[in-house]
Amino acid sequence: VKDTYGGTNVIFSEFLHRFNIDVTLCDTTDHAQIESEIAKGCDLVYLESPTNPTTKVVNIATLVHAAHQAHAVVVVDNTFATPINQNPLSLGADLVLHSATKFLGGHADALGGVICGQKALIDQIYHYREINGATLHPMAAYLLLRGMKTLDLRIRQQNESAMKIASYLEKHPAIEQVFYPGLSSHSGHEIASEQMRGFGGMLSFMLKENSFDAVRQFVPRMKFAHAAANLGAVETTIGPPATPSHVECTPEQRAAMGIPEGLIRYSTGIENTADLIHDLQQALSIF
């Protein structure tokens, strides 16, 4: 799919062609297009659900069925959902990825990644990792293990707060649109309700004054939310996708992914929910 995390999109659109790997990018929400491309023949289907930053939702089980009929491997980036809220392997996916730097670690102090899935595939990946040296250093491993002890507690709080914040923002006169799978207005709400146990701590919203200038006025006014590229930590972070997640993409590429210049990504922390809502209220008062 084309509306993935910015770094992933650059790998697909720029790097893989150098290795003679053909890539077809599809709209996450256009399941008919994805199934049509799969039917033409492919080796791997890469999905992200919910997507970064617009939280689009993919019907994982449906696309897994289509991919397996074409004998393709299905890989799902589950970073936004976390294992607490969604388990793509139980929906038939072959491999699942997590940026452990985000929710798994939860404290914005360790870099790491996780891949899990079918043993035969993992064995191949493990062998490749032995050769290229992509090994987690001991301190990062310790910090991630420490962070995962509180994963369930953190995610439950982030789920609850994000739902309340999204509901508040949806009614605010300065907000044009809120993107959060937990809202009934979200295009993927029905699918998310079926395949997710919780809707996650990530949301994004578009200012009615849809411009990057408006974003630059708004973000510095936040007191609790830190302007940062990271997400999934105990601290709330905020920022426009133009700077953290999709800085590698041009404005035209972001627009093609459905990411407007007035969009703001919000990673809900574990602070008091009322404090976070009050913080948004005072920051939005300039509009």
For the regions a language model picked out, list residue spans one by one.
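Short phosphate-engaging motifs
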Residues: 8, 121, 165, 210-214, ...
